[in-house]
Structures are given as C-alpha cells and as structure tokens.
Swiss-Prot record:
This is Subtilisin-like serine protease Rho m 2.0101. It comes from Rhodotorula mucilaginosa. It comes from the Eukaryota. SUPFAM superfamilies: Subtilisin-like. Belongs to the peptidase S8 family. Gene3D superfamilies: Peptidase S8/S53 domain. Glycans are attached at residues 137, 171, 335. PANTHER family: CEREVISIN-RELATED, PEPTIDASE S8. Residues 1-30 form the Inhibitor I9 domain. Residues 39-342 form the Peptidase S8 domain. Residues 1-30 form a propeptide. CDD domains: Peptidases_S8_PCSK9_ProteinaseK_like. The keyword Signal does not apply. The active site is at 75 (charge relay system), 107 (charge relay system), 267 (charge relay system).
Length: 342
C-alpha cells in the first residue's frame, strides 16, 4: 500500500494495470467461542458445510448471544429451576384453568433449553419466560393458546414501556388444524414487535393446512436431519420459511434439575430459530456502526428477511419444489456485517 496525495490518486487510477483504489482500513480478528461436546443441532447451524467428524459436536458462537433479550416459550411450561438455565428462567403465566405452575410434560422445557440453556442453547444468555398454554398431556384449547400469545405481547409491551429488555422473541412449538383466529393472533403479535418462530408441523403435509404454521408474519420452521435431509415427518410447502435441526435433539427436561432428553419434531427445530432470533437481537450493530439500525432496533419483518437471506441455501435433500431449501445459520461467531447488510 502507498500513501498517495489526492491528485496522484486520480493519475494512478487511470493506469491500465489498476483495477481499483481502496482506502486502507483496519481489520479486527473477532473473538468467538467454541463449545465442544455440543448437540449436533447447534453444531449444524454454526457451520456452512455439512457436519464432519471434526465439526459434528462443535458450536461456534458469540458468547454475548442472547444478553438482554427475553424469549417467551408458549408451550407446556418450563422447568424454571433447571440448573442449565442458571436462574435466567422464570414463570410467566399458566393459562389453562386449575393447572399448576410447572411443566408436567417436558416438551416446553426441552424447547426452552434449545433457545437459551447453557449447554444446549443457541442464545446462552437469554431470559426465558414460561407461558403455559398446554396441559401435562401436551394438548390444550385453541382459546388458551391465543390467550398465551396475548400474554406474551402484553408482557413485551410492558417491558418496552419500562425501557428495559425491549427486545422479545417467542416460540410456539405446537400446532393444530387451520385456525384463522390463531394465525391472526400470531400475526398481530409480530406487528406488536414480537419476533416469532413457529413449528411447521409433523404430518408430512403442506404446512399451509395448519396453524400457526400458516401465520405469514411468523417464521415457520421445518425440521432437518444430521445428514442434511428434510426429516421424514416435517411439513413442507410455501408456508415454510426455513429449516433447522429437528431429529434426535438433546436438551433440558423434567424429572430433576439436571434432566435431559432426546426429542424429535419440528417442535425441536422451531426453538433453534427462536434462539437465533434472540441471538441476533442481542448482537445488533452499535450506534457507531455503519449498519446501525436505529434506537428502535430491527423490526421482526426485517430480521426475518435477514435470517432467511443469511441461511445456507440448497444443502438439504428431499425438499419439495415449492418449499424453500434454506438451512439456518448463525454466522459461526464471526463478523456479522453480511447479516446486517442484507
């Protein structure tokens, strides 16, 4: 590199062997963390290439991920005292009448662990809030689910008013038949500022036939396998936005404060995305960055767009023609300028 005076620069630029002149700039190495012995799902979303013997249990990430962001787990409840949550999980609300403030099923605890637990979570510093809408048998009424969504929205709005933790995500790993009322509630929640991930469903059918998978403002998540194929049960179609690991996923569970379990389903894929939303929200560019979004932060619509654009394209097998072939990616703990520049 040469230091050039302004008039010389123009002369040099005209020379036939000069393609372009660029101002010299400092480049910083980004410190990133590698979690060894991580679940394969975390490893997969932090590598562009298919997993190998050297990478299958390594999660590459920014250790600040999740800080200051709240994630609402709208599910069977959460084992909030589990040691993996390190005191970051709290009980929000129990919607089904007469039900206890605990996860008697395990499903919600497993999802919460993928979002923000210490060993199994995408965003390891996230604040987790349990919103119980399903009973211990794993089922519940559509009206209770809608009430749970409304509770999350109100809680988010309350924290925005207080000026703290003003970024919130939500995960809903549940589904049923097509319900315009539920889709409406989820779409309204996203408009109110909640960054929302929902499961595509496990019927190996068009996700547009089910709710909340057909809620267009949310991010609808299909399930992929360790060998980069669509999981045999995963719903598909144009209502699916992205895929994430969903077969044999290790996470937190119930029964003790150290319990774990392997579960499969688009229910396990969706919290990878809720975790990623939480992760990215906490790592938004600072005010001195050229990518600074503004004091209000990134909107759910824009973050959804960036997340999909930044995903790894065309690596999954058995994806029907009308379904986006995109696998979630976290940036491997490196510089995220490409993510914010989308």
């Amino acid at each position: 590199t040469m230091e050039l005076l302004e008039d010389l620069i123009e002369q040099v630029r005209q020379l036939p062997m000069v393609n372009f002149i660029e101002k010299n700039s400092l480049v910083h190495a980004n410190e990133f963390t590698v979690a060894k012995g991580a679940p394969w799902g975390l490893a997969r979303i932090s590598h562009r290439d298919p997993l190998s013997l050297g990478s299958f249990d390594q999660y590459l990430y920014d250790s600040n991920g999740g800080t200051g962001v709240t994630s609402y787990v709208i599910d069977t409840g959460v084992n909030v005292h589990h040691e993996q949550f390190e005191g970051r999980a709290k009980w929000g609300k129990t919607i089904p009448q007469g039900d206890e403030d605990e996860d008697g099923n395990g499903h919600g605890t497993h999802c919460a662990g993928t979002i923000g637990s210490n060993a199994y979570g995408v965003a390891k510093n996230a604040e987790i809030v349990a919103v119980k809408v399903l009973r211990s048998n794993g089922s519940g009424s559509m009206s209770d689910v809608i009430k749970g969504v409304e509770f999350a929205v109100k809680s988010h709005q309350d924290s925005v008013k207080k000026g703290k933790n003003s970024f919130s995500t939500a995960n809903m790993s549940l589904g049923g038949g097509k319900s315009p009322a539920l889709d409406l509630a989820v779409n309204a929640a996203v408009k109110a500022g909640l960054h929302f991930a929902v499961a595509a469903g496990n019927e190996n059918q068009d996700a547009c036939n089910t709710s909340p998978a057909s809620a267009e403002n949310a991010i609808t998540v299909g399930a992929s396998t360790i060998s980069d194929a669509r999981a045999y049960f995963s719903n598909y179609g144009k209502c699916v936005d992205i895929f994430a690991p969903g077969l044999n996923i290790l996470s937190t569970y119930i029964g003790s404060d150290a319990a774990t379990a392997y579960l499969s389903g688009t229910s396990m894929a969706s919290p990878h995305i809720a975790g990623l939303l939480t992760y990215y929200l906490s790592l938004q560019p600072s005010s001195d960055s050229e990518f600074f979004i503004g004091a209000e932060g990134i909107t759910p619509a824009q973050l959804k767009k960036n997340l999909i654009a930044f995903g790894t394209p065309d690596v999954l097998a058995d994806i029907p023609a009308d379904t986006p072939n995109i696998l979630a990616f976290n940036g491997a703990g490196q510089n995220l300028t490409k993510f914010w520049g989308h």
